């Protein structure tokens, strides 16, 4: 079930605004897109994203809707199978943190897995924290202080579309410090 009955936008399809993407890791370790679940109403949507698996263990990743909230999600499996969380890896890679605009958030992406932050996370095999704020990626020092508390491998700041040149000139030195 979704939090809003607004499933799409004039400039963005249901598959991105309200859909879910399923990816499976292939035998070579690459993430492969399997399916997109597109709702046709706010609640009681049912779809099969994959069937006929070979009985082996598979690693899966689900991307949630870019703009609509999920209030309930159930995942069904064939009788005799189950879903297990991955064990916590104490040597896990630190995340890439993206801070930016609606573009960073995923505006106009056709599907949740097609946002550039998600693509980079899969290709680099790293967790991603997406802090894209529609119209509000403005390099504020208060937000920078909070983001600096994150233990990240790298920070990617992509706020330029929300700022004018004088603001960039004033805020970048403070941000870097």
PLM regions and their residue ranges:
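Short loop/turn segments at strand-loop or loop-helix junctions that form parts
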Residues: 2, 100, 157-160
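N-terminal secretory targeting modules
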Residues: 1-95
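Alpha-helical cap/lid subdomain in secreted, periplasmic
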Residues: 136-177
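Surface-exposed, flexible loop/turn segments at secondary-structure boundaries
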Residues: 28-30, 104, 136, 163
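Serine-esterase "nucleophile elbow" of acetyl-processing enzymes
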Residues: 53, 60-133, 137, 141-149
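A generic structural signal for short coil/turn motifs at secondary-structure boundaries
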Residues: 8-9, 105-108, 163-167
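Short acidic-hydrophobic sequence patches enriched in Asp/Glu that either
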Residues: 14, 112, 116, 171
């Amino acid at each position: 079930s979704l939090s809003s009955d607004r499933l799409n936008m004039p400039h963005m399809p249901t598959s991105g605004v309200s859909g879910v993407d399923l990816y499976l890791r292939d035998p070579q370790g690459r993430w492969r897109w399997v399916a997109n679940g597109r709702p046709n109403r706010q609640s009681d949507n049912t779809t099969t994203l994959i069937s006929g698996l070979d009985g082996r263990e598979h690693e899966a990743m689900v991307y949630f809707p870019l703009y609509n909230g999920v209030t309930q999600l159930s995942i069904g499996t064939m009788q005799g199978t189950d879903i297990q969380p991955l064990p916590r890896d104490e040597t896990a890679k630190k995340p890439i943190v993206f801070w930016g605009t609606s573009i960073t958030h995923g505006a106009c992406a056709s599907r949740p897995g097609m946002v550039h932050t998600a693509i980079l996370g899969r290709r680099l095999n790293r967790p991603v924290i997406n802090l894209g704020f529609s119209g509000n990626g403005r390099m504020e020092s208060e937000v920078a202080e909070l983001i600096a508390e994150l233990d990240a491998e790298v920070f990617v700041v992509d706020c330029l579309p929300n700022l004018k040149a004088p603001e960039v000139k004033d805020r970048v030195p403070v941000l870097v410090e």
